[in-house]
Regions:
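Catalytic cores of Mg2+-dependent Asp-rich isoprenoid enzymes
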Residues: 1-55, 66-75, 89-96, 111-217
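Short alpha-helix boundary/capping elements
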Residues: 60-65, 85, 101
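Portal/gating segments that form or line small-molecule/metal binding sites
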Residues: 80-87, 91
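Acidic/His metal-coordination segments adjacent to aromatic residues that form catalytic metal sites
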Residues: 96-107
Length: 217
């Protein structure tokens, strides 16, 4: 059986806080985000990245049933039926990743567009709804996650600075479906507030932060 759960430690832990009726779908969205990230991580030519990102848009947004059939993740996402809401925010995720795919230099504006697209789109899909707070929270998480994977410390610092500007807008609601998002935000926001680059990604101190946040959020 194909494993369609995410591999990143934080997203795997967050699934434990998701409502049981939303957990499977949230796992698929986290896994899908990892698949998009993998497109950018192989040092490929920008044109190849663009083609592979466009494939996901064609399959999931444009509804090209001739593509993707038999691909386990595509089949799993299509099985319950993709709504207009899903397609809208899938498109935003793809556009967000496209903002940084193959870019030689990234401006604060590029990072803002990436954050709103990838992070805002993903968090909206995870919650099954969207709001300015959900988009801001997703943007903070996406910039924090990007900073953890950059070899350029100066660009990573810019990511955290852009994320800091989003903090006032990231006031998430108290619904159970948003709980994993609140916890992800708490983990990322702590580093963002301190402008501390998560050099090794999710580590022991983040795990402690997640546990503490889970007691109150």
């Amino acid at each position: 059986m194909v494993n369609l759960r995410p591999s990143a430690p934080l997203s795997r832990l967050l699934l434990g806080y998701a409502p049981s009726d939303a957990r499977t779908r949230q796992a698929l969205w986290w896994h899908w985000d990892e698949r998009l990230a993998a497109i950018l991580q192989g040092g490929r030519e920008p044109a190849i990245m663009a083609i592979r990102l466009a494939w996901w848009r064609d399959v999931l947004v444009q509804g090209d049933e001739g593509k993707g059939r038999g691909e386990p993740l595509v089949d799993a996402l299509r099985k319950p039926g993709l709504t207009d809401f899903d397609r809208q925010y899938i498109g935003r995720c793809v556009e967000g990743w496209g903002q940084i795919a193959g870019a030689e230099a990234l401006s604060a504006e590029d990072l803002q567009a990436y954050a709103q697209g990838r992070g805002g789109g993903l968090f909206s899909l995870l919650a099954g709804q969207s709001s300015p707070a959900i988009v801001a929270a997703g943007g903070i998480w996406a910039l924090w996650d990007l900073a953890a994977h950059l070899s350029d410390p100066e660009l990573a610092a810019v990511c955290l600075a852009v994320a800091q500007d989003l903090l006032p807008d990231a006031q998430l609601g108290r619904s159970t479906v948003e709980r994993p998002l609140r916890l992800a935000l708490m983990v990322a926001a702590h580093d963002v507030q301190q402008q501390r680059i998560p050099i090794r990604g999710f580590g022991p101190r983040h795990y402690v932060r997640l546990l503490l946040a889970s007691l109150t959020r």
